[in-house]
């Protein structure tokens, strides 16, 4: 075995590699016991920078009959990454014959492995934030982690901006309490605010190491054979099917990314119908497929035996697929960081080029494609910010820490305040959380199930009920979704193969005998019982495609700004790049019939139709912020003039349709102020209903609502009813309940993007209003008209109506 200081160099030399400067810097920092955040492009060698640093610093030696106890804790955001990471970490241990073991602990870990880990944790444990918290609830958790020397948080950018990251901050605070100064390293890519990312992970300070960012990245676009001058969203992009087939054919192995699981299912079916000879050579991958199916797809990708995989964000992160030569993105990626992340799935190794090809689903996405490439070259990457003062996560953490050995309030308070998320936690907030887990707050004191934590005679707070402890452990985590039904093949004797899971709301719309598309198969629904939908294969040609909530992502601010810059250039007759030259006829028509948005103007259009008077406004603020702006402006104008409006939005702008004419030239400038923004936004929307929806998630995280045991899961309707009851009880009898306030704050920050709304209003008020009266809707307005009709027409009627409108508008455009 080489000397410890030569371990890394020896292993690199064995593979014909030379360490990069950033890798050497990390090695030296870990040897000094320092912490840090390593930021480098995908596939640049971050994993081995930190892993080989650990081997050099901690000098593995034989420990008698046993392999070394736990030395390194490796936290990953996805269970799918754990096995892949384990293989990557095991390789140098095997080749250098080092006496360390590597183990995985996640929701997929079998009972035999869990039992082994209960006796002794492996030298290196790869786990998720949820499983780490579960390990910390054990009575001997401190003893289990007594030999821990290093924590590594992989893909930190994926955890930073959500409650899973907050949960991890609290877990790390517990480990740091046991091991003051515990070295911690975060690994990150595609992030625009590195200082904040480092400060959240390392509140005591640490290094910021910038890795190689010069990885070759090629971004190109498949240009449609014909440019539609009247585009509309909602296409699956299947007009590009032949061209996508040609691109897949030209590469040994490709990933085809879609933004939704339903779109992935549709594209998989379409590709197989277009190329039956690809059966067995292409595959489908998304989070709702059965684990063994996803494992098979990932193994086959690694082995290079698949021509293409149609996938969603389930393959966004760090799984290492060396054979993948290129990535195709169907539709807009909606953000620069997401596009970079997906591009990095190809050429996933130092020195190799990554290539992503954008496949527009409608003509305006050509402008987005040009904007995305320009923003990538300029390095404009989205920032992510940690949530603050998540009281539901704190309540869950208090109960978790009361399990096992329990906690003393003063010591745990110091721990909690050492995290970035709770550094400003007030004494009153802490006392409320403590009272809530002990007594259920001021409104649940009569119910024993909500008196989860008890103060013992020795001053230690513990959970004494085994039943409540078991329920709590099953609910640990912050990932909340609608109840899912297992999808299984029907077998009279039971025990049919599991295909995956679908949302209860989708299955509720089907009756036995109806057909659906799932996992690339056409299936017939047989029956539904005990949260399981039983199906059999079907030969039907048409079927409903399984749908999941959460499919529409808003356009990021960075991509939206880059998009407006491209339109500004077009307004000044500059059409750079193949995408902008291709879409020039559409933009020329927009300029002829109206005007193009620019960086110095705010385009607004008015139009009279049989439906009424239309206002189209284009802030380019993303779907959610545009929805907030539309409601805000309609409400503010209605105070001066009684107004009944219907609203349609997309990422570029919104439509207000009213039965009466409105003097927008005088009303709009007044409606764009930021004064009283919070009050006006809350008044303009059904904020109570939105807060109730958000409270359902908060109630589950805080442990108020139990989702049921594995064999007896509660339905979405049951969970909604329970959380709705709590919401009303708190609203009427416990108005100071901090979970209610949190629900409102989350609606404002996450659903209405109040900060973005504020910034957008400031920006809009500084722009010159360009109000155009239209004789007929132009390309930008047409996209919004279709969004409005989508709410009132069936799919077939909508398609017919759009076809007639396009024919009429094309005739007018051709007539000049």
Curated annotation (Swiss-Prot):
> Where along the sequence does the record place the motif called DEAH box?
154-157
Instruction: Identify the residues that bind ATP.
Output: 23, 46-47, 154-155, 328, 345, 348
Annotated PROSITE patterns: HELICASE_ATP_BIND_1, HELICASE_CTER
- The top EC class, named as a word, is isomerase
Keyword Ribonucleoprotein attached? no
The record places domain Helicase C-terminal at 240-402
Query: Which UniProt keywords are present, listed alphabetically?
Result: ATP-binding, DNA damage, DNA repair, DNA-binding, Helicase, Hydrolase, Isomerase, Nucleotide-binding
Give site residues, Wedges between bases of the loading strand.
497
EC nos: 5.6.2.-, 5.6.2.4
Cofactor names from the entry are:
Mg(2+)
Record-annotated Helicase ATP-binding domain positions: 27-193
Cofactor binding note from Swiss-Prot or TrEMBL: ssDNA-stimulated ATPase is most active with Mg(2+) or Ca(2+); Mn(2+), Co(2+), Ni(2+) and Zn(2+) stimulate at low concentrations only.
| Catalyses which reaction(s) | Couples ATP hydrolysis with the unwinding of duplex DNA by translocating in the 3'-5' direction; ATP + H2O = ADP + phosphate + H(+)
> What remark does the entry add?
Part of a locus with an MPE ssDNA endonuclease, a putative exonuclease and DNA ligase, which suggests the locus may play a role in a DNA repair pathway.
What's its job? A single strand (ss)DNA-dependent (d)ATPase probably involved in DNA repair, translocates 3'-to-5' on ssDNA, unwinding any encountered duplex nucleic acid. Unwinds 3'-tailed duplexes; both RNA:DNA hybrids and double-stranded (ds)DNA with a 3'-ssDNA loading strand are unwound, substrates where the helicase loads on a 3'-ssRNA tail (DNA:RNA and RNA:RNA) are not unwound.
Query: What's written under domain?
Result: Composed of 2 helicase domains, a winged-helix (WH) domain, and Lhr-specific domain 4.
- Record-given protein name: ATP-dependent helicase Lhr-Core
